[in-house]
Amino acid sequence: SEGSPENRICTNNCAGYKGCNYNCDTNIASYKSVCEGEFDPKCLR
């Protein structure tokens, strides 16, 4: 797992998709970052 303690990664509904773990912070940039550069609507669940 790549994730600094300062970036808490929350595994949520996206867990089954493409390793789509999203950051606890609701910043779109963070979503894009953890979603492997792909901004996917599933990441917003």
From Swiss-Prot:
GO terms for molecular function: serine-type endopeptidase inhibitor activity. Signal peptide: none annotated. Belongs to the protease inhibitor I20 (potato type II proteinase inhibitor) family. The keyword Disulfide bond applies. Disulfide bonds join 10-24, 14-35, 20-43. The record marks 32-33 as: Reactive bond for trypsin. It comes from the Eukaryota. Transmembrane segments: none annotated. SUPFAM superfamilies: Plant proteinase inhibitors (SSF100897). It is found in: Secreted. One of its GO terms (cellular component) is extracellular region. This is Proteinase inhibitor IIA. Inhibits trypsin strongly and chymotrypsin temporarily. Keywords: Disulfide bond, Protease inhibitor, Secreted, Serine protease inhibitor. Its main location: secreted.
